[in-house]
């Protein structure tokens, strides 16, 4: 009986090893997409306290622009994290056009996380904007964090004074549509925050996008192993899906990861 258990465990270990090796070898054959764009990941360390303070966002916007160092002559996609402009809703972003248009050109595209308000529902959204802050595309988060983004049994528990952890009195709503965003000659699968942890459940058809994009606010983890664990999930997903992955975080680990799970930058 002991010999059987030993052999069984050994077969499982070797099976996992060879499956992983085969998957990595297969992913070596994935063709790279060569873009006419530079891609800049913007990875600030803006305090999580902003979620609980009614701060004017102009200084934060200027800080993000300074980190971005935009060159108006270069085709560039700037990728900002989730929620860095927590006091601005998508519907109000054009109020700050005068700042953005002074620093970005028509050669630039901006990707960032913003809250959006649609039909009296609030969504955690990833948006693609041009330098005039016109909306090119938008994705609403599918998988929400319980108690962080929504309060389960809200109608009942709110009567006892409970609410979600993040700012605002109202829970976020989830969208049930997984979306591929097409931007000129490239396409990507957008994932917001912990949507990256769902192994094997990102999307059914992997053929129709070039890479995975994950934006996140990791300041909620504080000084813990959380940001490193969250980052590890990104590596696992890139290997499983056989896709390059770009990750932009605030207070976390940002990186370019190739389809073999190797950190390129």
Name every feature range the model reports, one short phrase each.
Residues 1-265:
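Enzyme catalytic cores with a strong preference for nitrogen-chemistry domains
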């Amino acid at each position: 009986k002991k010999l059987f258990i030993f052999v069984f465990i050994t077969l499982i270990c070797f099976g996992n090893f060879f499956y992983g090796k085969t998957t990595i070898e297969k992913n070596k054959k994935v063709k790279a997409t060569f873009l006419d764009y530079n891609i800049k990941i913007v990875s600030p360390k803006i305090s999580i306290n902003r979620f609980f303070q009614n701060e004017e966002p102009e200084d934060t916007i200027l800080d993000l622009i300074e980190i971005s160092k935009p060159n108006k002559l270069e085709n560039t996609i700037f990728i900002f994290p989730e929620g860095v402009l927590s006091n601005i809703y998508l519907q109000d972003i054009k109020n700050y056009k005068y700042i953005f248009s002074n620093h970005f050109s028509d050669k630039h595209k901006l990707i960032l996380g913003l809250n959006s308000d649609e039909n009296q529902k609030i969504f955690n959204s990833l948006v693609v904007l041009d330098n005039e802050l016109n909306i090119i595309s938008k994705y609403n988060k599918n998988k929400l964090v319980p108690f962080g983004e929504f309060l389960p049994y809200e109608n009942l528990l709110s009567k006892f004074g409970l609410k979600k952890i993040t700012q605002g009195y109202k829970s976020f709503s989830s969208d049930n549509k997984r979306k591929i965003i097409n931007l000129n000659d490239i396409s990507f699968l957008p994932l917001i925050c912990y949507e990256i942890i769902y192994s094997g459940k990102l999307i059914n058809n992997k053929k129709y996008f070039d890479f995975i994009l994950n934006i996140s606010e990791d300041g909620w983890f504080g000084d813990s192993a959380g940001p490193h664990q969250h980052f590890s999930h990104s590596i696992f997903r890139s290997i499983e899906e056989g896709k390059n992955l770009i990750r932009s975080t605030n207070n976390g680990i940002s990186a370019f990861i190739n389809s073999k799970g190797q950190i390129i930058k």
